[in-house]
Design a protein with these regions (language model features):
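HIT superfamily nucleotide-processing domains
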Residues: 1-141
Length: 141
């Protein structure tokens, strides 16, 4: 892993689910839905316009892996992506798998309370680190 100090808030050293050449996918601590993640550009740039062509070219591969994983592992039926960068001034996407029914996993009943409307990405439950690692490890399998 290269120097990712600028994104330390998202703890990539412990929360990385999958690393690509230009992007890293990390489990999101504040969960609105099962499998929430943050997709981070591994190079610090303050605007989406700053994404290089080769980084942009890899992004669909990252999203495909993420969507396939969440669909296969959790039964996700749709996905929402949010890019705001209001507090963290580097390119990253918040990714939310969406569910049309409850999912029982990890000793928890996960309900997508906003289905079929827009996900509440500001709310959510902050999971303890053990639960996050359990979900992350399951997604990595």
């Amino acid at each position: 892993m290269s120097d990712l100090t600028f994104m330390s808030k998202f703890k990539p050293e412990t929360r990385c689910i999958k690393e690509f050449k230009y992007w890293i996918v990390c489990i999101r601590a504040k969960c609105s839905t099962l499998g929430d993640a943050v997709i981070l550009l591994k190079r610090e740039t303050p605007t989406v316009a700053g994404i290089l062509p080769e980084e942009a070219a890899e992004f669909p591969e990252v999203v495909k892996w993420y969507e396939d994983t969440c669909t296969k592992k959790f039964g996700a039926v749709k996905f929402n992506y949010v890019i705001m960068m209001m507090k963290d001034f580097f390119v990253h996407y918040h990714a939310f798998p969406r569910y049309d029914k409850e999912v029982e996993m990890f000793e928890t009943t996960w309900k997508d309370k906003d289905w079929p409307g827009a996900v509440d990405f500001v709310g959510g439950t902050i999971l303890d680190e053990d639960k996050l690692m359990e979900i992350k490890d399951y997604m990595k399998e």
